[in-house]
């Protein structure tokens, strides 16, 4: 992942130092009033979370982040219910839940129909993944197969959707219990 979309310079995050990343202006692309805004550290972000509010942390790298993330979570004043991990990588979710079982973690997955018109991943694959990773639920795009959603939630898992920007989609997801 890079800083191309947000910053005044394009750096590859995983190949950059914190010092280099902190020098970037990540505000000007929105509006000049935000000029000079810097990338915060995770501890600074945690410190800005108000009581009774939550933060969803999307892990885009691999397992190597877990020890550092757990350390920063431990140093924060946030309660377990305030920090939720989301990730496509099943092994990251599993490792996070092994270390911090009291925190919620959701498996990120999109749904597509195959050539035969069947949803992928299948209901069995979703339920097996949630159980194997000890995830608390699923977080998906707005393209939600209703029957799979109902069965997953009936099995006791939560389901959330990302990037819903219109009222009709929001109401459809709400009607499903998402």
State each model region's role.
Residues 44-54, 76, 133:
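A structural motif corresponding to the C-terminal end of an alpha-helix
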Residues 1-51, 103-120:
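An active-site metal/cofactor-coordinating segment within enzyme catalytic domains
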Residues 21, 45, 57, 89, ...:
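Conserved, mostly hydrophobic/aromatic
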Residues 54-56, 82-85, 102-106, 136-139, ...:
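Structural preference for beta-strand elements that scaffold enzyme active sites
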Residues 32-36, 108-110, 115-178:
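C-terminal active-site rim and adjoining tail of enzyme catalytic domains
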Residues 31-35, 54-60, 82:
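Second-shell loop/turn segments in exported
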Residues 63-66, 90-95, 142-152:
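Active-site-adjacent beta->alpha loops and helix N-cap segments on the catalytic face
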Residues 64-76, 92-102, 116-124:
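Distinct, well-ordered alpha-helical segments
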């Amino acid at each position: 992942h890079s800083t191309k979309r947000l910053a005044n310079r394009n750096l590859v995050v995983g190949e950059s130092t914190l010092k280099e990343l902190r020098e970037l202006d990540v505000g000007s692309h929105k509006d000049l009033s935000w000029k000079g805004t810097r990338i915060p550290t995770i501890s600074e972000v945690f410190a800005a979370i108000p009581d009774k509010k939550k933060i969803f942390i999307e892990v885009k790298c691999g397992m190597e982040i877990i020890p550092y993330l757990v350390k920063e979570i431990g140093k924060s004043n946030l309660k377990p219910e305030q920090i939720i991990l989301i990730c496509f990588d099943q092994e990251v979710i599993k490792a996070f839940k092994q270390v911090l079982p009291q925190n919620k973690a959701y498996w990120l997955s999109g749904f597509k129909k195959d050539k035969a018109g069947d949803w992928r991943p299948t209901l069995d694959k979703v339920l097996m993944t949630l159980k194997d990773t000890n995830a608390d639920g699923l977080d998906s795009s707005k393209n939600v197969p209703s029957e799979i959603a109902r069965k997953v939630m009936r099995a006791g898992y939560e389901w959330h959707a990302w990037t819903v920007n219109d009222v009709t989609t929001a109401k459809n997801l709400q009607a499903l219990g998402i």
